[in-house]
């Protein structure tokens, strides 16, 4: 009965990387990806490698999580088209010195058994092999528009879709993709533009769900009050469903989108000022913290975490971003977007007292570099021929201050997998480094 944040990574098939690229391999044999790797974000093995809840092929699980339909025919790296239920076997996964094959049993695609259909698709895909292949039978089907971004855009071209789709495991063990959809405009009255394109209105009005096996697509109204999506819903009444119609096991995975939150954070940096005179003079502008990562200075990105917000009784899944005063490095405030239950979409902000110094991310980076114990250890690792990789610096609100956590990974120069070796924690004026966060 505890909230646990986990990472999921689908094992998709990148046909561009096939060692032996030919029409049969690309269209008949290597037709789909297989399964996911999943594990907790805060656990590693004794050697510093990720701890897995789901691993291997076929998927092996150590928890109640299960995958009953691991094949991924529709995803982010899918083929232009594939042919299934043919005389050629589809590779499912390798097992030792042999391969395991399968036959597609889903309802995706369209039949391609007749001569005329073969002719039409051969012309459409500019491939005479579709028309002339002896591998096709009366039961064969062609699966196309397998890339999920392309698929949802074909159905709803009037919606702008988030490029960062994420895969989830439904309660029955099936895999689904969730994609955030936006309605936007550049013609909203009395609204400042957000970009060079002039957009001054945006709403996360749609959640698209794509079945990774069958390719079926459902659109759910996540912001039914948006007048633009109301108009589209009336025009296409059978395309959109209310968010309450989304199955509960999928709805539990819905999260607040990072791109929308980043836009709102940039607006909040100016419009958090309530006093008209202060606002007019821009006396209290905020900035998104900047950090030096791999030699380049970049804006800090919002990140998902589980924490208990001030005034709340229990922890929840949120999207968080801290702020610094304009052209200064100390921390000024943070903004959080909530994702759980009835609180979905609510934004919470907390400002630190101006009289209290709370270190910002750039200042913490500098203090880590200046710490003699930490710098000596980093130098020692580097002298032994290892590469030190500093992970994301997370700022976790603790009452009216911040706890900073940064993992350190070690990798050999000859391409070995990085291993978690140390964790740096900073709170107030204290900085420490240890092998674990456990007390």
Go through each PLM region and give its residues.
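Soluble extracytoplasmic regions of secretory-pathway and membrane proteins
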Residues: 1-439
């Amino acid at each position: 009965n505890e909230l646990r944040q986990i990472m999921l990574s689908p094992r998709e098939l990148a046909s561009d990387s096939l060692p032996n690229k030919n029409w049969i391999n690309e269209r008949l044999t290597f037709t789909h990806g297989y399964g996911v790797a999943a594990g907790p974000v805060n656990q590693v093995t004794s050697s510093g490698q990720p701890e897995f809840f789901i691993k291997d092929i076929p998927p092996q699980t150590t928890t109640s999580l299960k995958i009953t339909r691991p094949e991924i025919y529709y995803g982010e790296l899918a083929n232009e088209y594939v042919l299934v239920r043919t005389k050629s076997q589809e590779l499912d996964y390798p097992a030792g010195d042999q391969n395991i094959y399968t036959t597609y049993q889903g309802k995706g695609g369209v039949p391609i058994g007749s001569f005329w259909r073969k002719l039409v698709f051969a012309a459409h895909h500019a491939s005479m092999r579709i028309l002339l292949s002896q591998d096709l039978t009366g039961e064969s089907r062609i699966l196309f528009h397998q890339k999920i971004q392309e698929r949802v855009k074909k159905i709803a071209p009037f919606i702008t879709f988030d490029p960062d789709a994420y895969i989830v495991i439904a309660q029955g063990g099936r895999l689904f993709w969730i994609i955030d959809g936006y309605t936007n405009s550049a013609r909203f009255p009395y609204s400042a533009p957000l970009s060079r394109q002039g957009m001054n209105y945006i709403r996360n009005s749609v959640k698209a769900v794509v079945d990774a096996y069958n390719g079926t697509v459902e659109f759910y109204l996540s912001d039914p009050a948006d007048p633009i999506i109301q108009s589209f819903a009336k025009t296409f009444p059978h395309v959109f469903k209310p968010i309450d119609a989304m199955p509960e096991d999928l709805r539990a995975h819905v999260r607040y989108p990072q791109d929308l939150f980043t836009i709102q954070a940039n607006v909040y940096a100016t419009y958090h000022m309530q006093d008209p005179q202060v606002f007019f003079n821009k006396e209290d502008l905020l900035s998104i913290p900047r950090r030096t990562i791999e030699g380049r200075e970049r804006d800090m990105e919002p990140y998902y975490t589980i924490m208990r917000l001030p005034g709340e009784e229990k922890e929840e899944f949120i999207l968080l971003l801290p702020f610094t005063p304009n052209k200064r490095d100390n921390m000024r405030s943070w903004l959080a977007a909530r994702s759980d239950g009835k609180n979905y979409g609510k934004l919470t902000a907390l400002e630190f007292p101006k009289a209290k110094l709370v270190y910002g991310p750039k200042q913490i980076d500098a203090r880590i570099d200046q710490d003699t114990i930490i710098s000596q250890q980093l130098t020692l690792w580097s002298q032994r021929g290892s590469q030190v990789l500093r992970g994301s610096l997370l700022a976790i609100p603790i009452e009216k201050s911040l706890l900073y956590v940064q993992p350190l990974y070690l990798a050999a120069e000859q391409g070995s997998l990085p291993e978690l070796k140390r964790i740096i924690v900073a709170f107030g004026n204290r900085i420490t480094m240890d092998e674990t966060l456990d007390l």
